[in-house]
């Protein structure tokens, strides 16, 4: 048949992978090639099988990075001609009320207009997703193009967890409700955890944590999302690298008075808050380094983050009636920082979760009857698998 390009455009990065559709159908998960661009360090990493190359790159835009990645794929003979690419799937966070499907949505003129109309629902991620998708449509004009929205996974949440306690017309007429995010990761991790636990996907109960630059939690009952920490936008919930997380709405007028405009306040809350706002560093590794050097605010920021995650775990255990099959962790912090994970789970022995004293790793074998799993997030593969079902 052909090849699938899977694109995950973040606020300052792009992750792309190219897959052979026959290989995916045969159960192979390794892409033909992978590309990752990080704007802040001006580097692009390319992987072809076991070979990995890091390149210094001068460009600033997501479109340039996308084109660079495609050119490198082509030079490495991952594909020769544009018509070999039959499908392109782009991760997007939130397209609004009308684009709430857990499955990939084919991009039509109407879908594109609706997505553009709701671009501000995820101000850090939606704009680059739109930018790269448009570039891909021009380059691979003969292919089918899809968006896969994070929020679709959470469309199964009960109405009580979607509503805010505002006048009902805010929900019915304005469309203000909790959409959530990180849905592609959560959907994939639910499938993978159920397989590992040998539990039917429609019966598995999980607490999912995605802890990286963006952080959130998700309660899953009988294989469906029932609650999540992110809300109308991905700014809500846990504190994150540059996002403030939950905040009293009563402070908003004061912030507008201080910063001068709503636009500036939104920029501060999404791009200059969280760990960055408290410490000047967005990366947990650098925040920990500051803490080790005696920076009091860095220590406070880490303690606050750990406490927020602990509170959510407790709340979701109660929401799931303490019938939890596993806690599943993903994201850069969860996948690489076992010390932070260990501090998060300390004290949960009383509800059946017990971690080994060996602080070098956390695996399900080291726990009591509620295992903690660390699963590496792979949104690109999850999207490729999902979109393949739409085209075969």
What are these regions (language model features)?
Residues 248-251, 255-280:
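Oxyanion-binding "anion nests"
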Residues 325-347:
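Glycine-rich phosphate-binding loops at beta-strand->alpha-helix junctions
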Residues 4, 13-60:
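Short glycine-rich, Thr/Ser-proximal phosphate-binding strand/loop in the N-terminal lobe
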Residues 73-125, 144-146, 152-161:
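Short beta-strand-loop/turn "lid" adjacent to the catalytic site in phosphate-handling enzymes
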Residues 335, 339, 356-392:
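Glycine-rich phosphate-binding/hydrolytic loop that grips phosphoryl groups
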Residues 72-85, 195-200, 313-325:
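Phosphate/pyrophosphate-binding loops at sites that engage ATP/ADP/AMP, CoA/4′-phosphopantetheine
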Residues 267, 271-280, 284-320:
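Adenine-nucleotide phosphate-binding core of ATP-dependent small-molecule kinases
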């Amino acid at each position: 048949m052909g090849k699938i390009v899977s694109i995950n455009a973040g606020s300052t990065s792009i992750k792309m992978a190219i897959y052979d559709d026959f290989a995916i159908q045969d159960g192979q998960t390794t892409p033909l090639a992978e590309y990752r661009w990080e704007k802040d360090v001006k580097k692009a990493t390319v992987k072809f099988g076991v070979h990995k190359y890091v390149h210094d790159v001068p460009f600033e835009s997501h479109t340039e990075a996308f084109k660079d990645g495609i050119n490198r794929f082509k030079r490495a003979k991952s594909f020769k001609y544009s018509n070999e690419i039959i499908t392109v799937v782009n991760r997007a966070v939130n397209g609004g009320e009308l684009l709430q499907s857990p499955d990939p949505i084919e991009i039509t003129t109407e879908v594109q207009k609706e997505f553009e109309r709701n671009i501000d629902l995820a101000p850090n991620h939606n704009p680059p997703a739109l930018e790269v998708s448009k570039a891909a449509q021009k380059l691979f004009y003969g292919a089918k193009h899809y968006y896969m929205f994070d929020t679709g996974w959470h469309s199964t949440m009960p109405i009580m967890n979607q509503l805010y306690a505002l006048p009902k017309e805010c929900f019915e007429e304005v469309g203000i409700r909790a959409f959530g995010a990180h849905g592609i990761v959560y959907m994939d991790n639910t499938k993978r955890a159920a397989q590992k636990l040998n539990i039917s996907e429609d019966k598995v109960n999980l607490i999912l944590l995605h802890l990286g630059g963006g952080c959130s939690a998700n309660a899953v009952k009988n294989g469906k999302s029932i609650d999540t920490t992110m809300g109308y936008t991905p700014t809500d919930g846990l504190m994150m690298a540059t996002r403030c997380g939950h905040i009293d709405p009563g402070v908003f007028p004061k912030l507008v008075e201080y910063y001068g405009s709503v636009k500036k306040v939104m920029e501060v809350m999404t791009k200059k808050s969280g760990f960055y706002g408290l410490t000047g560093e967005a990366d947990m590794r650098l925040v920990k380094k500051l803490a080790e050097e005696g920076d009091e605010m860095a220590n406070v920021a880490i303690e606050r983050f750990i406490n927020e995650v602990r509170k959510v775990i407790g709340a979701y255990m109660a929401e799931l009636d303490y019938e939890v099959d596993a806690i599943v962790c993903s994201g850069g912090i969860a996948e690489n920082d076992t010390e932070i994970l260990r501090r998060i789970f300390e004290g949960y022995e009383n509800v059946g979760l017990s971690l080994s004293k060996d602080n070098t790793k956390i695996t399900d074998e080291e726990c009591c009857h509620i295992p903690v799993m660390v699963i590496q997030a792979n949104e690109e593969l999850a999207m490729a698998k999902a979109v393949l079902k739409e085209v075969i």
